[in-house]
Design a protein with these regions (language model features):
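Nucleotidyltransferase catalytic core that binds NTPs
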Residues: 21-260
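Classical Sec-dependent N-terminal signal peptides that target proteins to the secretory pathway
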Residues: 1-21
Length: 260
């Protein structure tokens, strides 16, 4: 029995060492995108990820372990919006690729929001908030929005934002490389909400933007945020393994991020 357990452990370790995130551009290039996404549930996880921390990774792990989604597509805010002080998107993308390097059910990409929409969506005849819309290109693909409770609570107060949030609107020229482009690029049918410390979404009554909240997730890192990580670094404190993964830590050190 012990020998069998050792063999199984070795197999798991070998598989883990070979596992890696899926790069959307590679799926397109290799002609595997449709086979990968058809009849699948895809979590669409957008955020600043400045930097991506262990709380983000835990949210993704829980979604996949609980079979809430088949894959999770991670997409950073590109910038151009009211938050002017984000780290350059290319550096944040580098950190995301490092953070999720060994997650075989995670999809990462460096495509702009317009390129992302062009790959995953096709034009629809209907209008959303009076604007041309899009729908999924592949049969049976269902997208589920993954958002933080802060986003859910803040956005729920703004009817204008609610009317377009993750509804799949054809991206106009001015938003092709913009945070708003990522927000409107893909229509989601439901939401998974990650709870932040001190937040309650009871007031939403299980619905956000006229679509159901299918799951709320509490992580072991509920008090951890990108803001907290940045403050730790700025204050000169050590960034240990309880905050970010080793790959992300190395990139932060390489670029001397968050020193000011």
């Amino acid at each position: 029995m012990l020998k069998i357990k050792l063999i199984l452990t070795m197999i798991v370790c070998i598989y883990a060492s070979m596992a890696h995130a899926l790069v959307l551009e590679d799926l397109v290039k290799d002609g595997k995108l449709e086979a990968t996404l058809s009849q699948k549930k895809i979590g669409y996880y957008i955020g600043s990820f400045d930097p991506p921390h262990l709380g983000h990774e835990d949210v993704v792990n829980q979604i996949l372990e609980q079979n809430l989604c088949d894959y999770v597509l991670i997409y950073p805010a590109w910038g151009g919006d009211e938050y002017k002080n984000r780290t350059d998107v290319q550096v944040r993308l580098e950190m995301l690729f490092a953070a999720f390097a060994n997650h075989p059910k995670v999809i990462v990409t460096k495509l702009t929001s317009a390129e992302l929409q062009g790959v995953l969506m096709k034009r629809d005849e209907s209008l959303v908030a009076g604007k041309p819309s899009v729908k999924t290109t592949f049969i049976g693909t269902e997208y589920i929005g993954v958002i933080g409770s802060d986003t859910a609570l803040e956005t729920s107060k703004d009817l204008k934002k609610l009317s377009v949030f993750m509804r799949g609107i054809q991206i106009p020229e001015k938003y092709k490389e913009h945070t708003i482009g990522g927000i409107i690029a893909i229509p989601v049918q439901s939401f998974i909400v990650s709870l932040r410390a001190g937040d309650s979404i009871d007031s939403l009554k299980g619905v956000f933007s006229d679509r159901p909240i299918v799951k709320t997730i509490s992580t072991d890192y509920i008090d951890l945020s990108s803001t907290k990580v940045r403050k730790i670094i700025k204050n000169g404190s050590a960034l240990d393994k309880s905050f970010v993964s080793q790959g992300v830590k190395e990139i932060i050190e390489k670029y001397n991020l968050y020193q000011e």
